[in-house]
């Protein structure tokens, strides 16, 4: 029998592994407004920077407040982990740049938020990443657009402004066939549309 998933409201408040502040035992998550952290010594610092040991190095890399947020968002979405960034366009950029480089291409849905179209057209193109567009009304259009340089499919769950539901399963099945990941912008339906089934599928 599978373990019952907590309600989203419970996960939002208690998700992740945070229970209380180790210094004060306060149950509310503190807002750490620091940029730097004190090391226990030179060996401790060296281990952190060499990534031999997990811990706080610099707030742009890791912050205890962000850590709690990321674990809770991952729990809400049913994902394995999460990275918080300052905007949706940053998230889209990170996702694409994680898998593609100059000379590669991404096959994207034609139904896209205007800001994403600008990102793809004016920014990623300058980095040598080609964006090919496929009409999602027929998922086979994604398969027709790929070649050996295709590094990802891209779509929006409920695209702005059309709100035509993206065929997630059909396109992800094509991606599995060719070992191409599907990057989804889930801005319009977070928590409601769970794109991952592990580690905690919604009942």
For the regions a language model picked out, list residue spans one by one.
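Active-site core of PLP-dependent enzymes with the aminotransferase class I/II
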Residues: 158-181, 188-194
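Conserved PLP-anchoring active-site segment centered on the Schiff-base-forming lysine
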Residues: 98-116, 134-135
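Hydrophobic beta-strand scaffold residues
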Residues: 131, 182-183
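Conserved small/polar residues in nucleotide/adenosyl-binding loops
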Residues: 196-203
């Amino acid at each position: 029998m599978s373990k019952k998933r907590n309600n989203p409201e419970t996960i939002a408040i208690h998700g992740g592994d945070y229970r209380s502040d180790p210094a004060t035992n306060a149950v509310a998550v503190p807002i750490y407004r620091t940029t730097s952290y004190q090391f226990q010594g030179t060996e401790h610092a060296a281990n952190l920077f060499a990534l031999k040991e997990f811990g706080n190095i610099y707030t742009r890399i890791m912050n205890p407040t962000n850590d709690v947020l990321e674990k809770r968002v991952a729990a809400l979405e049913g994902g394995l982990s999460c990275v918080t960034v300052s905007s949706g366009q940053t998230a889209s950029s990170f996702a694409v740049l994680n898998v593609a480089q100059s000379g590669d291409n991404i096959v994207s849905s034609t139904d896209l938020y205007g800001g994403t179209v600008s990102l793809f057209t004016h920014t990623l193109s300058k980095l040598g990443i080609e964006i090919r567009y496929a009409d999602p009304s027929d998922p086979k259009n994604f398969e027709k657009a790929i070649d050996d340089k295709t590094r990802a499919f891209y779509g929006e769950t409920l695209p702005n402004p059309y709100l035509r539901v993206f065929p997630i399963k059909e396109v992800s099945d094509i991606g599995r066939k060719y070992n191409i990941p599907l990057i989804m912008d889930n801005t319009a339906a977070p928590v409601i549309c769970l794109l991952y089934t592990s580690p905690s599928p919604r009942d």
